[in-house]
Each structure stands twice: as structure tokens, then as C-alpha cells.
């Protein structure tokens, strides 16, 4: 009888443990970009943090937002403009951290010998629609009094393509220049079919900060798990900042499966370093620039102070003794 009771208690304990473990799953949406590598690495160390992370890769940040709205994700890694557009469109999210800075570069065909934005007049420029690169491109064109549209007739003709297709378009001379992300812009330069014109960090946005967002339900309703995830994010990011060899190997071998070289990675991260922080001021400046340039076409732009929440990040950094 004692054995039966004992086995029953063990079985019940296993069921309870399984249920608790299921509650610890965090659904993460991410992008396949070099500076998103530390976010991918979270899933590798997640068991040490007491959670399990299920990562899903998307083509662009707006797709991450759609998955959040559909209830398919708890956490998303995007550029700030996708998060802002998502919040404006009803996505129930809060910004909780930044994880990389920069990550944009204007690259042109070497034979054109372009040295500044003003020389884009009469050219075809590729960019990914709705990405932070589009915001920065439109801001730089406006600073140089250049009009732009996807239809011919403006100073600059825009060609909208996914990040993965921009390099091929430049290589095949379908476009003259591109505002590209990393590591793709570094690849174009290192392989000789692209030349840097400029890094677009002279606008009010400065270096764009990539944003980590959580759903309000996850942030408020599963706070202990959200805290564990944030600590795991900080640990993963610190590992990549402190151990560049680890970061390079993981991004090249695991994220890109050998598609980029060590030089590509080094050059990419030099232009998009890993980081932790984000501020309401930065999100507001990006929001204001989106309104000014018309990217996102938001009816009611969200106020940054209403949805930037960095308390979990601050607590995680303090507990791990990171300034």
C-alpha cells in the first residue's frame, strides 16, 4: 500500500512539475541579422535561467508585430520603427530593453563613385519597406531636399525589397544604391560590389536602437517569468560583449550557418554593437521622425512615456552588477 501511495505521489509531483515547466516557456520572435545574435543566444542559456525559449525567425519587424497581435509571441526583437508602428496599430506591447545600436549603412555601386546623399538624385535606391533603414533614408533625403517615391518622377526612385534581396539587386545593377542592414552591407563592401557612402546617424534619431518588446500580458501577468527572461537577455548580451569569439562563432555558424565570414561579422558588429539600454527620449525622437517622413502612416502616434518600461532591465543589470 505504501508503495502504491508513494508511486502516486511521485506521479502527481511529475505532473505538477511538467505543468510548471510548461508555464516557463517564452515564445520569442526574432530576425536573422548579425546584431540580433545575442537575442538568439538567449535560447541556448535559457535552461540555466529556469525557462525555455522557443524562437521563431521572421523576415522583418512588422511580421513580428503581426505575430504578437495574433497572440503567437510573448517577446519580440525588432527595430524601433516596427515596435512604434505596432503599438500605434493596437499591438499590446511595451518596450523593455535595447539590444543593439546602429545597423544601417548607405551603400552604392563602386563604379558610380557616390560620396554623399545629394548625389542620389536621378538614382534608384533600394530599401526594405517599413524598416528603420527606410526612416533613416527618408530623413537623409529630406535633409538634402530630395523627393522620393516608388513611382518614377521624383528625385529618387525607391525600390522596396526585403533585406535578403537588396544585395542581389545591387550586384545585378537593378538598383544604384541601398540603405541596408548588417551584415548585408558589410558583405556587399567586402565582396567588392558595394561601397560605403555614409552611415545615416546624423538625424535627430542618432544611432537607431533595436528594441526588445514584451506583450503587456506577459509583462504584467507573468512577471516572475518576464524577470527570468530579462536576466537571461542581460547574461546573453554580456557574454557576446565580453567574448567576441563566442559571438562571432555563434552568429556565423548557428544563425547564418556559414553564410558570412569572420570579416563580415566583425565589420557588421563594428557598425551595430550589442547593447542593453533604451530610453523614452530615443523612442519619442524616432516616433517624431516617422511622423515627419511619413513612414508607418500612423493615425495616432504613441507617446513613448506611456509604453517604455525599463524597470525589469534595471533590476537585471543591478543583480548582475552591470552598469
Question: Predicted segment positions?
Answer:
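Bacterial N-terminal signal peptides that target proteins for export
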Residues: 1-9
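Sec/Tat signal peptide C-region and signal peptidase I cleavage site
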Residues: 18-22
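Pocket-lining segment of extracytoplasmic ligand-binding domains
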Residues: 81-82, 152-155, 159, 164-253
